Amino acid sequence: MDTISDVMKHCVPINYDDYDPLPADHFSTYPVFCSKATAEAIEASAEFTRKWKRACEVDGLHQDKLNFQACTTHLGHYNQWAYPDCLPERVSLNAVLSDCAFFWDGMSPVTGRSTNVMITSPVDVSDSISAEKMNELTQDFGIAMLSELQSGRRIEPRFEINKMAVQVIRDFIAVDPFTGIGHLKEWKGHLDAQEKSTHNNMSWEKYVEHRVNESGGNWGISVGCWTNDIRISDEEKESVKYLTQLACAGGILGNDYYSFPKEFDEHHRSGTLDRLQNGVALLMREYGYTEEEAKEIIKKEVIIREKKWMDGFDAWSRQAGPETGEIRRYLVMTMALMSGSMFWMSHAGRYHRTDLATTAEDRATLIGKSRGALRVLAGYPPPKNLEGIVREPLASAVQDDNGHVQHKDAVADSSVRNGVHHAFKKRNSRNGKQNGTEGSKSTFTNGNYVQPAKLQQHGTSINSMAIYTAPFQEAAGDICDAPYSYIDSLPSKKNRNKLLDLLNDWLQVPPSSLKRIKNIVHMLHNSSLMLDDIEDASALRRGQPATHTFYGISQTINSANYVYVHAVHEVTRLYNPDADELRNLHRGQSLDLYWRHHARCPSMEEYIVMVDNKTGGLFRLMLRLMTAESSISRPLDTALCRLLTLTGRYYQIRDDYLNLASADYESKKGFCEDFDEGKFSLPLIHLLSHTRYPDRITSALFNRKPGTNLPYEMKRYILAEMEEVQTLAYSQDVLKYLHEELMHALDETENRLGANDGIRMMLLGMGPKLLLC
């Protein structure tokens, strides 16, 4: 405690005697601190709220549907506890930033994500503005903000509330450009991460992992670096990431605890309960706990993580030297953010609502509504009312060698995920399926072969010859589909679907055809990923094991080919079943494989040809299919075709760069994985063209035992060589130049086809400014 207090300069430990009544629902064990500048924060929030309401009136946003509850509560201000050590001169702007983020984000309709105190608004989002209006507001804000950041081009927003929001961010960056830009990078990363997955049919461990990655925790921490003027490098952050993730996990689960009734109410009224993402809901749905049981588990999990953080911080402090002072401030700020947020949530009106339309009985309908088997939570007793929600009597359950309860019928095929066992398999599902397999499939009972039901109908028996002349029976598809189903379940941003929707603003493809094109592109993309991972010998895909590590190379290839054939069949059902771009995809991949097999470094010109066919081919396929199906009769637009070709190049070169320079990419694919693959990426081609010792590099890359990764020390050597010849700097220059050309190509396309704010915001959002900062 002394070590933590010594770091604080502008706050004091909270005096609980100052609060009457005390928040009865506060259970966090962290020390809580209070800013000395609370009055300034409250005053700034009040003034900003008045201006925001006036802006909403000008923009035609109905006040009766926007319940503005700012950071201020009856006990004080959110920031006085969450950012207690904020520099005095930054208190007012920080309060405005918090309210701006809360209000602006809070107008969004329910989207399926779990709200988080560090990024969302204390407003009733289920009664907020329409999705169409919110999309218009988002594009207006995004184009104005990203244009200024990426190209220095100042575009004034059309909406008054966006003018206020953009000005707040301008002021934020002007005060401290270093931490201000870092904050925007984390904000964008948070928004990107939210789009990757939902949490249905997910284990508790996997849920916590995903929430840490996709929540606003890192965004809130980046704001704390700005408020406290903390200067810390990415390497220093990485060295204590285990502690910041512990803190974030506790804060996220605390938010789930307090926000569950409100979130359930919002999703219930909007008809999106299947998209409710909350730890309490997950424990009820996937594990069968009651709301009270689930909340007690959440409490324990929060306290466990808080104790681990305190112990970990003490251990770190004992071995940390005087040069780690800034890291110490960073860690204490992170803890204070979670501690203060927990104190605020324990009494804020946002969570302690009396106007909810739903009741505890309504929330109880979630219990046991998993998509498959109920799970068993390691370290906790089973739900007390388990007998009342399972589809089979508990008496038929058995225990495995680890003491986990499982149903007899599920033992043979139960899976273990992160130590949590699938148990209590549901039976008698539709279409004759049982436990996820066709009812007619062959099985073994007591070591004896049991024939499919259809064969038994023909009077066959174990010793009968009739099975050899029985009618044709189509094989079940589940085994062939399994590898594809696995990769399809992995988190994804679904950028291609978004791009298709945005292109449709220009091309006007009928809904049924657009749906088929999306399915074609989705199947082709996932099929190519399965094959790419085999051809590249990749162990990871999107941070998870690659498909072939589970299903083997042969079965994965078979599944990928099966899906590819199905995609081609879907293409033939469209008006223009031209397969040119499908051929180009394979020709591009063949170049990549040929260069690797023969260890031949291509020229930059050859590299671009490969990219245009392999990566750009899928983009052009999307365009050609949509043009053929368009309700607007026009030939393939050359400007739009060029735009998508440049987009494919930018995607690939950005991917090449991130493979070597991004910590996030490293966590998903491994450290410099392109070196393991022997892939001739743009950085490697540049290095081999400029280093004095190209033979050393190629010898290390291509004279290895098959299936072995390049040693870590050799990867560091290659990176050092790249540093010497400025390879990564060159890659950055290429990205900057290519992005400028992308925006020029977009200008030309809009001149021909009309404005497309959605595509403009997408291209601005993937620009190099936030990528390279």
Curated annotation (Swiss-Prot):
Residues where substrate binds: D105, N255
Bias-annotated ranges (Polar residues): 431-447
Record's keyword annotation contains Transferase: yes
Record-listed isopentenyl diphosphate binding positions: K493, R496, H525, R542
Region (Substrate), start-end ranges: 211-214, 259-263, 350-351
Annotated Mg(2+) 1 binding sites: D105
SUPFAM superfamilies: Terpenoid synthases
Keywords: Isoprene biosynthesis, Lyase, Magnesium, Metal-binding, Multifunctional enzyme, Transferase
Disruption phenotype: Abolishes the production of sesterterpenoid.
GO biological process, one term: mycotoxin biosynthetic process
PANTHER family: GERANYLGERANYL PYROPHOSPHATE SYNTHASE
Protein name, entry field: Preaspterpenacid I synthase sttA
Taxonomic path: Eukaryota, Fungi, Dikarya, Ascomycota, Pezizomycotina
Name of encoding gene: sttA
